[in-house]
C-alpha cells in the first residue's frame, strides 16, 4: 500500500515494481501469509490494507484484470442500500465507512464503470441518523448524536473512570466533536449508548479515517452539503477547544 502511494507521488518505477510483485505473488490471498493474511480482502483497517493496495494497483496499471479483483469483492459487499452493512460487531461504523471509502475510490478510478456511490450514500445516511434508533453515530453533530463516547479525556462523562460506577452524563463535560463511535453490533441496529460498551462507543483514529475519506468521496460525487451552524466551533473562526478549570500554560519563543 505504501509502495503504491510512493509511486503516485514520485513516479519511481521501483515502487511500482514492488507493488506488483506483492500483488501478483503466488501466495497472495492465502491465509497465514506472514501472519497477516495478505491479499485476503476486508474493509480497510489498522490490520489489513490489502483492498487499498489492490485499488492503487488498478489505478496505477489501468489493467482490467487488476480492477476485477477489486470489483468482484465489492460486488459481494456493496449490494443492499436498505440494509446496514455490518462487517463485525466491534466497531461496525469503522468498517462501514472504510468500505464506503474504498468503494468510492473504485467508482472514481475504475475504467469498468463500476459505480457504488448510491450504496455509499445510503450507508452514510444510516450512520448519520436514518436508522431505527434515530441515532447519529458522529458525536456532537446533531441533537440526536450519541453522547457516551468511550473516551476518558473528552466524553461528556462525569467520572475519570467509567468503571467506578459513576455513569451519569454531565452536560458540562467535554464533547468529542466529530468522532465516529463504533456503532451497532449488527444490521438490525442493536446498540446502546453507554461509555462502558467499548464495542459500540469506542473511538479511534482509524475510525475517523474512513469517515472523512467516505465523506470526501461523497462530496466529490454529489457536491452537496453545508456546515451546520449548530455544531460547536462552526459559528466563527475559532477552532473547537476543550477547557479546564486551570489556565493553560503558554510557552513563547523569541522570533528568529
Give residue spans per PLM region.
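Aromatic (Trp/Tyr) and acidic
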Residues: 1-14, 18-25, 45-80, 89-240
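Solenoid-like repeat scaffolds
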Residues: 24-29, 36-43
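Acidic/His metal-coordination segments adjacent to aromatic residues that form catalytic metal sites
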Residues: 30-34, 77-86
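Extracellular mucin-like PTS domains
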Residues: 241-256
